[in-house]
Each structure stands twice: as C-alpha cells, then as structure tokens.
UniProtKB/Swiss-Prot annotation:
Residues 464-614 form the N-acetyltransferase domain. Residues 467-624 are annotated as: Probable acetyltransferase. This is Bifunctional protein ArgH. SUPFAM superfamilies: Acyl-CoA N-acyltransferases (Nat), L-aspartase-like. Keywords: Acyltransferase, Amino-acid biosynthesis, Arginine biosynthesis, Cytoplasm, Lyase, Multifunctional enzyme, Transferase. It catalyses: 2-(N(omega)-L-arginino)succinate = fumarate + L-arginine. It comes from the Bacteria. It is found in: Cytoplasm.
Length: 624
C-alpha cells in the first residue's frame, strides 16, 4: 500500500517501483521512525486530534512493533512497502485498524524522514565517539609501556631524528582527539528537531514543537520549516568528519605497515589481525591495516557523491535526497569498523625495542645535535649547518657514524669541536635536549602520557546519567508510572506512594530531562523488588534501562539487602543483567498479594527472576 494514490489512475510500473522504493536500505531507520511516531501521537493528543484512549492504543501498538523490529529487523525486507514510513504505517494499521490511519495527520514524510535521519545520526554519532575514545585509550596504554622505546623519526621517509614509540603513539592520539572534537561539534549542530515542519511550510495544527523536540530528546526545534526538510548538512558534516578521521586511520595504517615490514622489523602484529598466503607459507600479511587504508577511498567517495547530489537542488525536498542514506550508512559503518580494527591491531602489538634503537642510531639522526653544539660554540646556525653537512659526507666516506669519528677527524671540520662533543651525540642526549613542551625528552613524553590519560579520564563518554529521584521529580514520576500502568506494563502507584518511596526511586536523565525511572520496593530486611521500570520513547535501547537497574542493584547492596527479584514480561533483559529465573511460588505470600493490583492478574504472563546479592558479596570477598 502506497501512502499516495488518489491522484493516480494507473498503477506504477513494476520497474519504476523497484527503482523508486527505498525500503531495502532505509529499513535501518525503523526504530527511529517508530519513536518519532510515538512522539507525534502525543503531539496529536495535545491538539485533540487523538483522544487519550486512541493515543495510548497507538503508543502501545508502536512499542509492540518496536520490540518486534528489535528482535528481527530484517523481517522488514520481506515487505513490498515503498519505504520504512509505509511499512510502519502498514504494520500499525494491521494492529489497530483504521485508527492507524489517523497518525499521519499534520505530518509529511518530508519532516518525518528528516527527523528519523537525525535521530539515527545522533545515536550512531554517540557510538562513534565511544569508538574514538576506545582507540585513543588503547594507544595511550601502549604509549605508557613504550615511553623509553627509541624509534627513528622520519621526514620524506628518510631517517631524520630519534623519537620514542610513545611519542609516535601520542601523535595519532592528538589527531583522533581533533576527530572527537569535530564529531562532538557536529552532533551539537544536528541536535534540532524537524518534526512538525510538514512538507515544507509547517504543520497546520497548533503543535508545540519545542515540547515535541524535548520528547524526542533534541536540544530544540528547528526554526524554519523550509530549511528543516531541505537540510542535509548534518549528513555531509558527519561524512566529512568520517573522511578526515579515515585519513588519520590511513596514515596510521601506512606507518604500521611499514614498521611491520621485514625491512623495518619494528613491530609485529598479532596473528588475530593478519592473514597468510595461499602459495607462500612463510607470509604473515597485515591485512587489517591494508583494508583500513583501502577503505578510506570508499568513505571519500560517499562524501563526494553526497555533495554532488545536493549541490544544485532547489528548496525544498526532492527525490534526489533519497540518495543520502546509503552513502551515509556505509561511510559511518566503515569508519566504525576501521576504528575497531585499529584498536584491535594495538591490542596484541609487539614492539622490537632493540631493532628500533638500532635503526634510530643509523642515518646520522644526531646531525642536528652537532649543529646545535657548534651554535653553542658561537658559530651561526647556517654556517654550522654547512659544517655538519660536510662532516656527514666525511663519515659516509669512512663508513661510520658521526660519533665514531675521532676527535682529530671532527676538528678537521671545525676547530671549535672538543672532547665534550661525544656526550651530545648519544641517542639519550638527542632525546633529552628536546625538552620544550611537546618534545621527545623523557620528561615531556611522560608528561604528555599523563595529560592524555587525564583528558581521556575526564571525558564524559557515559551516554546515560542515573541519579536518585528528587521531590521535584514527583510530577514526572507520577506521569511515567501512570502511563506504564495504563499499558499494563507496571503496577499502579498513587502520588502519595511515590512521595513516600521517593528515596527508593532512581531516574535516568539527559541534559536535565528525566527519561526513565525505576524503584526498589522493600518487603523486609532481606528482600526487595525492582518496580516501576520504564524508559521514555526515544530513549530506549541506549543503555538507560541497564544503567537504572545497575544503580538499584548497587543501592540494594549498600542497604545490605540479600536478594532482589522482579516480575516481568521481558525476562531476556533481566537475564542480561545476571538475574536468574525462579518460580513465583517461591516468593513470599505478601509479594503475591500485591498482584491483586495488577490488571493482568487473571491472565498473568509475568516471569519471576532473582538476583542474589549475598552470593555476589561472598564471591567478591573470595576474589579479594
């Protein structure tokens, strides 16, 4: 079923339908489309297009559909729907009948897809930040281990001056830190909600778009409807960040491929990231790194293609913009995969310190030290530079290093050279003298490692904030608990009960907005139940439920509670949190009395699970 058709007297040619349909790739926006639809149903309720009963019925069906998609997203591909919006509407109508046809009131696929895409970009962007953080952390850890490992530094792929392996690692940590900053900035700019912009001129209904934006977790609503549906800057910006970061990954890969080669022998990659040859049994090829280098062009191509697509589009929406997704999905997936592989390459890396030191001593890498020595003796640098160049030629002719020339030979190039010259020609001296901020002296490298470690530790990579509930949260908690109770998901709780138990509630929040809640319900000194767990639409599947449950587990431990239990229709979630299934018949009678409040008490489909805190404490003591 198409979302359009009254204007047409003939069906679309099947070849055109295949050409036009986008479900084969935009199915990845299913969860975002459903979340956006839930928020839109609330907006329609606020302007009396939907009754409260209708909105709750739609939301229940959409949440049910969301769970089905989470379990098997590829089921969508069996449909002949035009796009993900059509598919969601078809499924919704299948669940609630003609009521599902009311949901699109005041909404266009133009603002719908713009919202879906921003929701997806925001979620994917946060995962990419975690990927960058993981890679940087891995490299800093390697740097800590190799602060004293001398490595030849190169210019023009010729040995130039000695550095350390830690200093080399930290150079890429700096590059990835700029990528992290760029990505964070891009996510801030895209954090505006287009929903309610309609096809191009805005919705005809008096929707509170700021409230709508807040419901979806956006910083604010977009300010211009025409721009809202035309804007794909965020797509290009994310792909631009990906392209720059892939450039850094490619340079990293190239360095490591060279260092791993038989000619260098500086590092050895683990078997886990290398492959062999079908003909030559001795080969151990750095395929992971070569693929990182090779996939860089693929990401560049996606960015170039996207920019070519939008460069001459008139406002507002045009079908060309359907081409924004495949390149975006592929570019960000590729970037994420390459970061993961790069981190994996560092996980098992072996550095041959003897070989790197030997290489650093070759190539007259201490020539600049000799020039600086002459400058200290009063010779102008340009003249000193020339003298050392002649000395290098002489050493090459002798087949030896500068420090292997006799004092008499060195004095033949400049009479100011004295016996103390040999002290400054050592590798240790070469490193020690580079003591300005950012240099390779041991002190500066140690400082740089320490500072990098501090920056990473201070970085807020936690997407989920959980805190104790406050009295100021009462209205929100009452609304959340009532909502999930009306859907039959949780037991109802009165306002007075929530106020009484406020100290046992925990909430998740984003930028001050409460996005979920749960509480402990204590039966006696040794037993407690997790109740009223619910996460707002738009914030599910982002770790909030897990974080809230873990918070309550920790709180229960602090309160010396011996056992937690939960009654739920989502046992898989709690099994992942290390709960184990138990029989409801084993629960105390006073627990089961509370089931009298449950709207499903006569057709109970809840599963009982428990978490034995006393066993956890005992196992921790044994480990200690």
């Amino acid at each position: 079923m198409a979302l359009w058709g009254g204007r047409f007297t003939q069906a679309a040619d099947t070849r055109f339908k295949d050409f036009n349909d986008s479900l084969r790739f935009d199915y990845r926006l299913a969860e975002q489309d459903i979340v956006g639809s839930i928020a839109w149903s609330k907006a329609l309720l606020s302007v009396n297009v939907l009754s409260k009963e209708e909105q709750q019925k739609l939301e229940f069906a959409l949440n049910e559909l969301k769970l089905e998609v989470m379990e098997d997203p590829h089921q969508i591909l069996h449909s002949d729907a035009e796009d993900i919006h059509s598919w969601v509407e078809q499924q919704l109508i299948g669940k609630v009948g003609d009521l599902g046809k009311k949901l699109h009131t005041g909404r266009s696929r133009n603002d719908q897809v713009a919202t879906d895409l921003k929701l997806w970009c925001r979620q994917q962007g946060h995962q990419l930040l975690l990927g960058l953080d993981k890679l940087q952390t891995q490299m800093v850890n390697v740097a800590k281990q190799h602060q004293a490992t001398v490595l030849p530094g190169y210019t023009h792929l010729q040995r130039a001056q000695p550095v350390t392996f830690a200093h080399w690692c930290l150079a890429y940590v700096e590059m990835f830190e700029r990528d992290y900053s760029r990505l964070s900035d891009a996510l801030t700019r895209l954090d505006t909600c287009p929903l309610g912009s309609g096809a191009l001129a805005g919705t005809a209904y008096p929707i509170d778009r700021e409230q709508l934006a807040q419901d979806l977790g956006f910083r604010r609503a977009t300010r211009n409807s025409l721009d809202s549906v035309s804007d794909r800057d965020h797509v290009m910006e994310l792909m631009s960040v990906a392209s720059i970061s892939m450039l850094h990954l490619s340079r990293l890969a190239e360095d490591m491929i060279f260092y791993n080669s038989g000619e260098s022998g500086f590092i050895e990659l683990a078997d886990t990231v290398t492959s062999g040859s079908s003909l030559m049994p001795q080969k151990k090829n750095p395929d992971a790194l070569e693929l990182i280098r090779g996939k860089t062009g693929r990401v560049y191509g996606s960015l170039a293609g996207m920019m070519m697509t939008v460069k001459a589009l008139p406002l507002a929406y045009n079908k060309d913009m359907q081409e924004d997704k495949e390149g975006l999905f592929d570019a960000l997936d590729t970037w994420n995969d390459c970061m993961e592989m790069a981190a994996l390459c560092f996980d098992g890396i072996k550095v041959n310190g003897e070989r790197t030191l030997e290489a650093a001593k070759q190539g007259y890498a201490n020539s600049t030290e000799l020039a600086d020595y002459l400058v200290a003796k009063g010779i102008p640098f340009r003249e000193a530079h020339h003298i050392v160049g002649v000395a290098v030629v002489g050493a090459i002719a002798q087949g030896c290093a500068l420090e292997e020339l006799s004092l008499e030979q060195l004095q033949s190039f400049s009479p100011v050279i004295e016996a103390d010259v040999y002290q400054i020609l050592t590798i240790e001296s070469c490193l020690e003298k580079r003591s300005a901020l950012g240099g390779v002296s041991p002190k500066q490298v140690a400082y740089a490692v320490e500072q990098a470690d501090k920056r990473l530790a201070a970085r807020d990579t936690t997407l989920v904030k959980v805190r104790p509930a406050r009295i100021t949260d009462i209205e929100t908690l009452e609304s959340m608990v009532a909502y999930w109770a009306n859907l039959g998901e949780n037991l109802p709780r009165t306002r007075s009960e929530i106020i009484r138990d406020i100290g046992l509630f925990a909430v998740s929040e984003h930028q001050g907005l409460v996005t979920g809640c749960a509480s402990l319900y204590i039966y006696d000194s040794g037993l407690a139940e997790i109740r009223s767990l619910g996460i707002e639409a738009g914030w599910q599947r982002q770790g909030q439920g897990t974080a809230v449950v873990q918070y309550l587990i920790d709180k229960a431990k602090d309160m010396a509670i011996k056992k937690l239990f939960v009654l739920t229709r989502a046992p898989e979630f709690f099994l992942k949190q290390n709960f184990v299934q138990t029989s409801k018949s084993l629960l105390p009678e006073k627990v089961l009395k509370d089931c009298d409040q449950c709207p499903r008490q006569h057709a109970c489909d809840e599963v009982a699970l428990e978490f034995n805190l006393s066993e956890q404490i005992i196992s921790q003591v044994k480990v200690a």
